[in-house]
Amino acid sequence: ALDSFEARGVTDEDIAKFKGGIESQYINGLQSVQGKVSQLAAFQTFTGNPNQIEKLLANYITITKADVLRVYNTYIKGKHSVFVSVLPKGQEKLVAAADNYNIDSTQYKAPDYGYNKLKYVKAKDNFDRSKIPGNGPNPVVKVPAYWRKTLANKVQVIGAASNEVPTVTITVTIPGGHRMQANQKDKLGLAGMFADMMNEDTKNYTAEQMTAELQKIGSSVSVGSSLDGITFRVQTLKKNLDKTLALLEERML
């Protein structure tokens, strides 16, 4: 694998796909509460700056082919490696490489974590655990504001806005799906097959080319079938919306 990498080198397309993917990955990771908390906590813990993501993305976005080759030649080429083989019981002959390294533990001294100084403090309850808690008030769910619109071609649209992260999610549903073929035995599986085919080649792109174009901008366009519809799903960064919609049009039409 490393020999083929050296022979092939790093292409502009490789760099474009990496940049698009890594930026999308970090930004999309901030959409959920868990994603925000985990990233803020990790950066605060290891760098002292909870907003380290800004600097991190800046470093990734400016990476070059020369940077990749420099790191490869400095840290990987000709360096020691570790092989880990997970084998079925009784088939040890499948091991990737012989076990030729032994850890020298003669000079090892276990660190003192201070466990022997800890004292167990038993929790004290302020309620009776033998009694089932009573019902509290029903929670009030605050539904985000949304809007509806009917386009000139009678297509109905529903949307909502959120300014937390610069992303756009689009779902286009066409009536159909498994329910419409339920009473037509000669068409069973047609909805699923149609959705699978729509994820393959288009008029101007092979499936591989379409995937590569989406990776360059960190977007996704997929087609799936459900009980009552065929659904086109789009996920993209706001700045790449126009390019992504062009690829959606290519896939749909």
Predicted regions mapped to residue ranges:
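M16/insulysin-pitrilysin zinc metalloprotease superfamily fold
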Residues: 1-29, 187, 200-206, 234-253
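Extended non-catalytic domains of envelope/secretory-pathway proteins
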Residues: 1-4, 36-37, 49-51, 63-66, ...
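Acidic/histidine-enriched alpha-helical segments
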Residues: 2-29, 34-40, 80-92, 211-216
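Hydrophobic, well-ordered secondary-structure elements that form the walls
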Residues: 22, 68, 154
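Scaffold signal of the M16-like zinc-metallopeptidase fold and its non-catalytic homologs
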Residues: 27-60, 92, 244
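Generic recognition of flexible, low-complexity loop/linker segments
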Residues: 55-58, 69-74, 145-147, 157-159
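Extended, domain-scale alpha-helical bundle/helix-rich regions
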Residues: 68, 74-83
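His/Glu-rich zincin catalytic helix
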Residues: 84-213, 217-220, 225, 231-236, ...
